[in-house]
Amino acid sequence: MSEEDVKSHKIEFPCEDYPIKVIGDTVVGFRDTVIEILSKHAKVDLSTLAERQSKEGKYTTVQLHIVAESENQLHDINSALRATGIVKMVL
C-alpha cells in the first residue's frame, strides 16, 4: 500500500457516523456497560444499536455509531472498554 493509499484511508475528524463494534463475554449488563462507557466519551446514536450473540452464546457483539472527534478520543474509548475485563475486542 502506497503512502497515498494510507492517507486516503485516514479518518477525517469530526466523523459524524463512526461505527464501533465491541466484542466481549456474554454477561448480564454487557450492552449497558458498553453504552455507558461510549456515552461518557462521545455522542452515541442509539438508533444504530445492534446486538448479537455468538453461535454458542459465549460472546456478545454490540455495534453502534458515535461522533468521533479525534484519535485520542478513540484511544480513550478503547482503553476504557478494555479496562472492564469483559471486552475482548474493539473494532
From Swiss-Prot:
GO terms for cellular component: cytosol. Disulfide bonds: none annotated. InterPro entries: UPF0250_YbeD-like, YbeD-like_sf. SUPFAM superfamilies: YbeD/HP0495-like. It comes from the Bacteria. Belongs to the UPF0250 family. PANTHER family: UPF0250 PROTEIN YBED (PTHR38036:SF1). This is UPF0250 protein PSEEN4821. It comes from Pseudomonas entomophila (strain L48).
